[in-house]
């Protein structure tokens, strides 16, 4: 009886994956015949699994995409921002590091203001169709 189950398991898996693939293709065809070209030009590596949202298909990767500076250049010296955790570091080196922190925060904040709410995510792409619907794909 168990061998019968294992022989049917690949067929069931193929049937279910085909049904999902056809339903996705039907939704993506609503964007027109040129959708594939746009998908290739915007997404180098699209993911194959999607979930539906009101704005279109979406897979949220949940990965944060924020660049964090790890060094501060003050008076020609490059100091790591994590150097305060080094036990044998002299107080002379720790002092310029603490003085440099406000300027480092100011640079990071100004970067965030310039980028606005639209961040470039190398793992996602969004294709907007002519009818106003959008498709967002994330790896």
Curated annotation (Swiss-Prot):
Disulfide bonds join 31-125, 43-138, 124-129. Belongs to the insulin family. GO terms for molecular function: hormone activity. Residues 1-25 form the signal peptide. One of its GO terms (cellular component) is extracellular region. May play an important role in trophoblast development and in the regulation of bone formation. Keywords: Cleavage on pair of basic residues, Disulfide bond, Hormone, Secreted, Signal. Its main location: secreted. This is Early placenta insulin-like peptide. Residues 59-114 form a propeptide. PANTHER family: EARLY PLACENTA INSULIN-LIKE PEPTIDE, RELAXIN. It is found in: Secreted.
